[in-house]
Protein backbone atom coordinates (compact mmCIF):
# COMPACT_ATOMS: atom_id res chain seq x y z
CA UNK A 1 0.00 0.00 0.00
CA UNK A 2 0.95 3.63 -0.39
CA UNK A 3 0.68 4.97 3.17
CA UNK A 4 0.76 8.58 4.32
CA UNK A 5 2.17 9.07 7.84
CA UNK A 6 1.41 12.41 9.48
CA UNK A 7 4.00 13.11 12.16
CA UNK A 8 6.68 11.10 10.37
CA UNK A 9 9.52 13.04 12.00
CA UNK A 10 8.45 12.32 15.57
CA UNK A 11 9.84 9.43 17.59
CA UNK A 12 6.71 7.33 17.13
CA UNK A 13 6.28 8.39 13.52
CA UNK A 14 9.90 7.66 12.67
CA UNK A 15 9.65 4.14 14.06
CA UNK A 16 6.44 3.62 12.15
CA UNK A 17 7.88 4.81 8.83
CA UNK A 18 10.82 2.41 9.13
CA UNK A 19 8.54 -0.48 10.09
CA UNK A 20 6.15 0.10 7.20
CA UNK A 21 9.02 0.32 4.71
CA UNK A 22 10.34 -2.97 6.05
CA UNK A 23 6.96 -4.55 5.39
CA UNK A 24 7.03 -3.50 1.76
CA UNK A 25 4.75 -0.48 1.91
CA UNK A 26 5.47 2.73 0.02
CA UNK A 27 5.54 5.52 2.61
CA UNK A 28 4.91 9.24 2.32
CA UNK A 29 6.00 11.09 5.43
CA UNK A 30 4.20 14.37 6.11
CA UNK A 31 6.55 16.84 7.81
CA UNK A 32 6.30 20.53 8.64
CA UNK A 33 9.47 21.87 7.03
CA UNK A 34 11.67 21.08 4.05
CA UNK A 35 14.76 20.62 6.23
CA UNK A 36 13.03 17.70 7.94
CA UNK A 37 12.63 15.76 4.69
CA UNK A 38 16.18 14.48 4.30
CA UNK A 39 16.10 11.92 7.10
CA UNK A 40 13.00 10.30 5.62
CA UNK A 41 14.38 10.23 2.10
CA UNK A 42 17.59 8.59 3.33
CA UNK A 43 15.66 5.52 4.51
CA UNK A 44 13.55 5.26 1.36
CA UNK A 45 10.41 7.21 2.22
CA UNK A 46 8.99 10.07 0.20
CA UNK A 47 8.76 13.28 2.22
CA UNK A 48 5.93 15.75 1.69
CA UNK A 49 5.95 19.13 3.40
CA UNK A 50 2.69 20.51 4.72
CA UNK A 51 0.90 22.08 7.67
CA UNK A 52 -1.98 20.20 9.25
CA UNK A 53 -3.64 23.54 9.95
CA UNK A 54 -3.82 24.30 6.23
CA UNK A 55 -4.72 22.53 2.99
CA UNK A 56 -3.43 18.94 3.06
CA UNK A 57 -5.74 17.19 0.60
CA UNK A 58 -2.96 17.11 -1.97
CA UNK A 59 -0.84 14.97 0.39
CA UNK A 60 -3.56 12.31 0.56
CA UNK A 61 -4.18 12.10 -3.18
CA UNK A 62 -2.89 8.79 -4.57
CA UNK A 63 -2.54 7.05 -1.20
CA UNK A 64 -4.23 3.84 -0.12
CA UNK A 65 -4.07 4.52 3.61
CA UNK A 66 -3.21 7.28 6.08
CA UNK A 67 -2.02 7.30 9.68
CA UNK A 68 -2.25 10.23 12.08
CA UNK A 69 0.69 10.06 14.49
CA UNK A 70 1.29 13.81 14.75
CA UNK A 71 0.68 16.16 17.63
CA UNK A 72 1.03 19.69 18.91
CA UNK A 73 4.09 20.60 20.89
CA UNK A 74 2.46 23.38 22.90
CA UNK A 75 -0.78 23.44 24.81
CA UNK A 76 -2.16 26.34 22.78
CA UNK A 77 -1.90 24.28 19.58
CA UNK A 78 -3.67 21.16 20.84
CA UNK A 79 -7.07 21.80 19.32
CA UNK A 80 -5.65 22.95 15.98
CA UNK A 81 -3.34 19.94 15.56
CA UNK A 82 -4.49 16.98 17.68
CA UNK A 83 -8.15 17.82 17.18
CA UNK A 84 -8.74 19.77 13.99
CA UNK A 85 -5.63 18.60 12.17
CA UNK A 86 -6.45 14.94 12.72
CA UNK A 87 -10.05 15.51 11.67
CA UNK A 88 -8.96 17.40 8.56
CA UNK A 89 -6.64 14.59 7.49
CA UNK A 90 -9.36 12.00 8.10
CA UNK A 91 -11.91 13.97 6.09
CA UNK A 92 -9.46 14.29 3.20
CA UNK A 93 -8.81 10.55 3.35
CA UNK A 94 -12.55 9.93 3.26
CA UNK A 95 -13.06 12.18 0.23
CA UNK A 96 -10.30 10.40 -1.68
CA UNK A 97 -11.69 6.97 -0.80
CA UNK A 98 -8.70 5.62 1.11
CA UNK A 99 -8.92 1.97 2.14
CA UNK A 100 -7.70 2.50 5.71
CA UNK A 101 -7.19 5.30 8.25
CA UNK A 102 -5.57 4.82 11.65
CA UNK A 103 -5.75 7.50 14.35
CA UNK A 104 -3.21 7.34 17.18
CA UNK A 105 -5.18 8.50 20.21
CA UNK A 106 -4.80 8.09 23.97
CA UNK A 107 -6.29 6.22 26.90
CA UNK A 108 -8.67 8.71 28.46
CA UNK A 109 -9.89 10.25 25.21
CA UNK A 110 -13.21 8.46 25.52
CA UNK A 111 -14.30 10.58 28.47
CA UNK A 112 -12.03 13.63 28.85
CA UNK A 113 -14.68 15.56 30.76
CA UNK A 114 -14.08 13.25 33.70
CA UNK A 115 -10.43 14.22 33.95
CA UNK A 116 -9.00 16.90 36.18
CA UNK A 117 -5.96 19.05 35.57
CA UNK A 118 -4.04 19.98 32.44
CA UNK A 119 -4.30 16.59 30.71
CA UNK A 120 -7.96 17.33 30.06
CA UNK A 121 -7.02 19.69 27.20
CA UNK A 122 -4.89 17.02 25.54
CA UNK A 123 -7.56 14.35 25.90
CA UNK A 124 -10.32 16.72 24.78
CA UNK A 125 -8.45 17.38 21.53
CA UNK A 126 -8.08 13.63 20.93
CA UNK A 127 -11.76 13.22 21.77
CA UNK A 128 -12.66 15.84 19.16
CA UNK A 129 -10.75 13.93 16.47
CA UNK A 130 -12.32 10.61 17.47
CA UNK A 131 -15.82 12.02 17.28
CA UNK A 132 -15.25 13.49 13.85
CA UNK A 133 -14.23 10.08 12.52
CA UNK A 134 -17.60 8.65 13.53
CA UNK A 135 -19.33 10.57 10.73
CA UNK A 136 -17.05 9.32 7.95
CA UNK A 137 -17.77 6.36 5.69
CA UNK A 138 -14.22 5.07 5.28
CA UNK A 139 -12.85 2.14 7.33
CA UNK A 140 -11.03 3.89 10.17
CA UNK A 141 -9.47 2.46 13.33
CA UNK A 142 -8.71 4.34 16.54
CA UNK A 143 -5.85 3.09 18.72
CA UNK A 144 -5.84 4.56 22.22
CA UNK A 145 -2.31 4.26 23.60
CA UNK A 146 -1.10 4.35 27.18
CA UNK A 147 1.68 6.74 28.22
CA UNK A 148 4.48 6.32 25.69
CA UNK A 149 7.99 5.36 26.77
CA UNK A 150 11.34 4.74 25.12
CA UNK A 151 11.64 1.26 26.63
CA UNK A 152 12.66 -1.51 24.27
CA UNK A 153 9.61 -3.08 22.71
CA UNK A 154 8.54 -6.57 23.71
CA UNK A 155 6.12 -7.19 20.85
CA UNK A 156 3.42 -7.81 23.45
CA UNK A 157 0.44 -5.69 24.45
CA UNK A 158 -2.91 -5.76 26.21
CA UNK A 159 -6.15 -4.30 24.92
CA UNK A 160 -7.75 -4.10 28.37
CA UNK A 161 -7.16 -1.09 30.63
CA UNK A 162 -7.14 -2.09 34.32
CA UNK A 163 -9.10 0.38 36.49
CA UNK A 164 -6.98 2.71 38.59
CA UNK A 165 -3.64 1.44 37.28
CA UNK A 166 -1.18 3.68 35.40
CA UNK A 167 -0.61 2.25 31.93
CA UNK A 168 2.37 2.61 29.63
CA UNK A 169 3.39 1.45 26.18
CA UNK A 170 6.75 1.48 24.44
CA UNK A 171 6.93 3.40 21.19
CA UNK A 172 8.27 0.26 19.53
CA UNK A 173 5.11 -1.63 20.44
CA UNK A 174 2.87 1.32 19.56
CA UNK A 175 4.37 1.42 16.06
CA UNK A 176 3.94 -2.34 15.71
CA UNK A 177 0.30 -2.10 16.78
CA UNK A 178 -0.36 0.56 14.13
CA UNK A 179 1.29 -1.52 11.40
CA UNK A 180 -0.71 -4.60 12.38
CA UNK A 181 -3.98 -2.66 12.62
CA UNK A 182 -3.41 -1.24 9.16
CA UNK A 183 -3.54 -4.77 7.72
CA UNK A 184 -6.69 -5.82 9.59
CA UNK A 185 -9.91 -4.90 7.83
CA UNK A 186 -11.85 -6.47 10.70
CA UNK A 187 -10.77 -3.56 12.91
CA UNK A 188 -12.58 -1.07 10.69
CA UNK A 189 -14.70 1.38 12.71
CA UNK A 190 -13.32 0.03 15.96
CA UNK A 191 -11.73 1.68 19.00
CA UNK A 192 -8.91 -0.36 20.54
CA UNK A 193 -7.00 0.35 23.73
CA UNK A 194 -3.32 -0.58 23.46
CA UNK A 195 -1.10 -0.76 26.55
CA UNK A 196 1.87 -2.85 27.60
CA UNK A 197 0.88 -6.47 28.19
CA UNK A 198 1.69 -10.12 27.69
CA UNK A 199 0.02 -11.08 24.39
CA UNK A 200 1.74 -10.89 21.03
CA UNK A 201 0.51 -7.80 19.20
CA UNK A 202 -1.02 -9.74 16.31
CA UNK A 203 -2.79 -12.17 18.64
CA UNK A 204 -4.11 -9.38 20.85
CA UNK A 205 -5.55 -7.47 17.90
CA UNK A 206 -7.05 -10.62 16.40
CA UNK A 207 -8.89 -11.22 19.68
CA UNK A 208 -10.42 -7.74 19.83
CA UNK A 209 -14.20 -7.56 19.64
CA UNK A 210 -14.89 -3.99 20.79
CA UNK A 211 -18.12 -2.12 20.28
CA UNK A 212 -18.12 0.49 17.52
CA UNK A 213 -17.39 4.06 18.55
CA UNK A 214 -20.42 5.31 20.50
CA UNK A 215 -22.27 8.53 19.67
CA UNK A 216 -20.93 11.70 21.22
CA UNK A 217 -21.96 12.39 24.79
CA UNK A 218 -23.79 15.57 25.59
CA UNK A 219 -20.76 16.68 27.62
CA UNK A 220 -20.03 20.09 26.21
CA UNK A 221 -17.53 18.51 23.83
CA UNK A 222 -20.15 17.62 21.23
CA UNK A 223 -23.86 17.03 20.76
CA UNK A 224 -25.20 13.52 21.21
CA UNK A 225 -26.84 11.73 18.31
CA UNK A 226 -28.86 9.24 20.28
CA UNK A 227 -31.10 9.51 23.34
CA UNK A 228 -29.35 6.65 25.09
CA UNK A 229 -25.93 6.11 23.51
CA UNK A 230 -23.94 3.06 24.59
CA UNK A 231 -21.25 4.09 27.08
CA UNK A 232 -17.65 4.33 26.03
CA UNK A 233 -15.68 1.75 28.07
CA UNK A 234 -13.69 4.59 29.60
CA UNK A 235 -16.81 5.90 31.32
CA UNK A 236 -16.49 2.88 33.58
CA UNK A 237 -12.93 3.71 34.66
CA UNK A 238 -12.12 5.74 37.81
CA UNK A 239 -12.01 9.52 37.44
CA UNK A 240 -8.22 9.58 37.57
CA UNK A 241 -6.85 8.80 34.14
CA UNK A 242 -4.31 5.96 33.91
CA UNK A 243 -2.35 8.38 31.75
CA UNK A 244 -1.96 10.90 34.58
CA UNK A 245 0.87 9.23 36.47
CA UNK A 246 4.38 10.54 35.91
CA UNK A 247 3.30 13.02 33.23
CA UNK A 248 4.62 16.50 33.99
CA UNK A 249 2.40 18.84 31.99
CA UNK A 250 1.72 22.36 33.21
CA UNK A 251 1.29 25.79 31.68
CA UNK A 252 1.55 26.78 28.04
CA UNK A 253 5.06 25.49 27.37
CA UNK A 254 6.22 22.44 25.41
CA UNK A 255 4.20 19.29 25.96
CA UNK A 256 5.91 16.22 27.43
CA UNK A 257 6.97 13.45 25.03
CA UNK A 258 4.84 10.88 26.89
CA UNK A 259 1.74 12.21 25.13
CA UNK A 260 0.78 10.52 21.88
CA UNK A 261 2.19 12.32 18.86
CA UNK A 262 3.65 15.19 20.88
CA UNK A 263 7.22 13.95 20.58
CA UNK A 264 8.31 15.78 17.44
CA UNK A 265 11.92 16.90 18.02
CA UNK A 266 11.70 19.88 15.67
CA UNK A 267 11.28 23.46 16.96
CA UNK A 268 7.75 24.61 17.77
CA UNK A 269 5.48 26.02 15.11
CA UNK A 270 5.45 29.84 15.27
Language-model regions, residue ranges each:
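Conserved dinucleotide-binding and phosphotransfer motif residues
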Residues: 23, 43, 136
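Mid/C-terminal beta-alpha module of Rossmann-like enzyme folds, strongest
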Residues: 2, 9, 172-270
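Structural motif
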Residues: 2, 64-65, 100
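Conserved beta-strand positions in the Rossmann-like core of class I SAM-dependent methyltransferases
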Residues: 4, 28, 48, 141
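NAD(P)H-binding glycine-rich loop region in Rossmannoid oxidoreductase-like domains
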Residues: 29-88, 92-95
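Glycine-/Pro-rich loop/turn segments that contact NAD(P) or position catalytic residues
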Residues: 72-161, 166
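N-terminal Rossmann NAD(P)H-binding glycine-rich loop of SDR-like oxidoreductase domains
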Residues: 1-25
Amino acid sequence: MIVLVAGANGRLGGLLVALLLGRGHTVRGLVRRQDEAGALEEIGAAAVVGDLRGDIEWAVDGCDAAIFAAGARHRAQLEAIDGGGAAKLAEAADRFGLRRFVLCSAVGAGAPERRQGPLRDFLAAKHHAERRLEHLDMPWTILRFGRLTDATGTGRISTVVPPGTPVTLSRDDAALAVAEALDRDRLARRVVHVIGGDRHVADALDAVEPAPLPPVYNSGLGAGQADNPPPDPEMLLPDASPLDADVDYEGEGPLPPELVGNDDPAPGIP
